[in-house]
């Protein structure tokens, strides 16, 4: 494993195929035929054809993120082993579409339009979803969006070479917690 491969793995934004959640099963989502669910066929196609990369500019990731946020209310009602049925998934897909239409005026949004990194008055489109290596957890924000509240934060990569130590580091937002500091949101 070389340094380039290590960085590729560290910053991987892709879900496995099939999903491999340890706490829920949504495999039925990929068995649903869009033609059997005309009211949600477009969002269903978007998710099913998605490459499972949670990049900020991905429409499939945007559709999946909105659906994922709608599944939360159904999760606790499911008996163990927490298998989402097509009936529950259809309801959640309808809610996801309604959410997109209400807040974004469309049924097709990029992940970065739905999910933001927020610090002070700075708001950035952000990659990532829960349960990938470069995971991002989010909470309700404003105007139908979500903001990242956990996940990638301070990262330091250290490489020991014959010429000495090489360090790469980044911290989300900035190096100060003081809103008036120029380093509050400069990274």
Model segments located where?
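Acidic, low-complexity N-terminal propeptides/linkers enriched in Ser/Thr/Asp/Gly that mediate export
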Residues: 7-187
């Amino acid at each position: 494993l070389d340094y380039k491969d290590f960085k590729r793995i560290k910053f991987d934004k892709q879900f496995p195929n099939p999903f491999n959640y340890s706490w829920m099963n949504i495999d039925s989502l990929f068995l649903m035929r869009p033609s059997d669910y005309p009211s949600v066929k477009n969002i269903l196609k978007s998710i099913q054809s998605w490459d499972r990369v949670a990049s900020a500019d991905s429409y499939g990731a945007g559709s999946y993120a909105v659906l994922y946020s709608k599944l939360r209310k159904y999760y606790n009602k499911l008996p163990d082993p927490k298998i989402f049925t097509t009936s529950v998934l259809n309801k959640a897909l309808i809610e996801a579409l309604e959410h997109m239409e209400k807040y974004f005026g469309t049924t097709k949004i990029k992940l970065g339009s739905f999910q933001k990194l927020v610090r002070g008055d700075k708001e950035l489109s952000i990659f990532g979803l829960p349960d990938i290596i470069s995971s991002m957890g989010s909470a309700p924000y404003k105007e139908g969006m979500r903001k990242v509240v956990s996940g990638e934060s301070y990262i330091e990569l250290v490489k020991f070479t014959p010429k000495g130590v090489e360090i790469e580091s980044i911290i989300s937002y900035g190096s100060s917690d003081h809103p008036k500091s120029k380093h509050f949101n400069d990274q």
